[in-house]
């Protein structure tokens, strides 16, 4: 880095932020007859009042144009753009302004991070465990907003006050015991417990049970009503 007598920047722009500190860089900007920006700390385009005289009108204007380091808009932090916008005369001057503002921008961004650090992990509040010392009680914990008909959070409920669970529903037979076809409402259930369809009315134990019942009934009827045989009629 080479500085002339009037404070012009003739060397590499990256050496400004490395060799000089933040305060030295601001002092250097003030010595170059330019005001510093209160937002980003960089010097603006317009020179300070009372210092732009120097050595005559035409020579002072040439000095101002030579000392000016035009840059584009500077990003101080992610998502925020600075208000210091300066016009550039050429591609070379624009690149030099960007390189000169890069170390200052990085230092300001690191300074903001150190002043307002953010936690890496979010700490969630820990809920207390339920009370296990109370015998014969159940603690119901409801997360979130309580609805109508629910128990509030942390209230012990006695087991005797809770209604008993409903009995299991009995499974009905809906298939024929002979062919396995679904019968629905058309099937009929025998006394033995089996369900049959219309094509297989009585099979297996049901037929045997009815046969035994019929035989016993016939025997009872025969005993109660003896057979009466009439005499044969002579043929004419």
UniProtKB/Swiss-Prot annotation:
Record keywords, A-Z: Metal-binding, Stress response, Zinc, Zinc-finger
UniProt xrefs under PROSITE patterns: ZF_AN1
Ranges of compositional bias, category Polar residues: 66-75
InterPro entries: AN1-like_Znf (IPR035896), AN1_A20_ZnFinger (IPR050652), Znf_AN1 (IPR000058)
Induction or repression: By cold, dehydration and salt stress.
AN1-type Zn finger ranges: 170-216
GO molecular function annotations of the record: zinc ion binding
Residues bound to Zn(2+): 176, 179, 197, 200
Record SUPFAM superfamilies: AN1-like Zinc finger
Record flagged with keyword tRNA-binding: no
Top-level taxonomic group: Eukaryota
Disordered: annotated span: 48-81, 150-173
Described function: May be involved in environmental stress response.
Protein name in the entry: Zinc finger AN1 domain-containing stress-associated protein 13
Species per Swiss-Prot/TrEMBL record: Oryza sativa subsp. japonica (Rice)
Lineage start: Eukaryota, Viridiplantae, Streptophyta, Embryophyta, Tracheophyta
């Amino acid at each position: 880095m080479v500085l002339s007598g009037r404070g012009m920047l003739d060397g590499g722009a990256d050496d400004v932020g490395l060799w000089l500190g933040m305060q030295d860089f601001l002092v250097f900007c003030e010595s170059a007859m330019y005001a510093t920006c209160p937002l980003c700390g960089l010097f603006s385009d317009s020179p300070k009042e009372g210092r732009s005289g120097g050595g005559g009108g035409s020579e002072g204007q040439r000095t101002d144009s030579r000392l000016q380091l035009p840059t584009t808009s500077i990003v101080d932090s992610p998502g925020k753009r600075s208000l210091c916008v300066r016009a550039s005369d050429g591609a070379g001057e624009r690149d030099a302004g960007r390189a000169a503002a890069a170390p200052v921008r990085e230092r300001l961004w690191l300074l903001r991070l150190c002043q307002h650090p953010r936690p890496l992990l979010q700490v969630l509040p820990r809920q207390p465990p339920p009370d296990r010392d109370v015998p014969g009680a159940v603690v119901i914990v409801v997360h979130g907003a309580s609805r109508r008909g629910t128990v509030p959070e942390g209230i012990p409920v006695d087991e005797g006050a809770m209604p008993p669970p409903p009995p299991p529903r009995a499974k009905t037979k809906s298939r024929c015991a002979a062919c396995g076809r679904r019968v629905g409402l058309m099937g009929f259930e025998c006394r033995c417990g089996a369900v049959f369809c219309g094509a297989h009315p009585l099979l297996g134990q049901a037929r045997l049970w009815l046969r035994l019942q019929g035989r016993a009934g016939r025997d009872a009827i025969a005993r109660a009503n003896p057979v009466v045989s009439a005499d044969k009629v002579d043929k004419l």
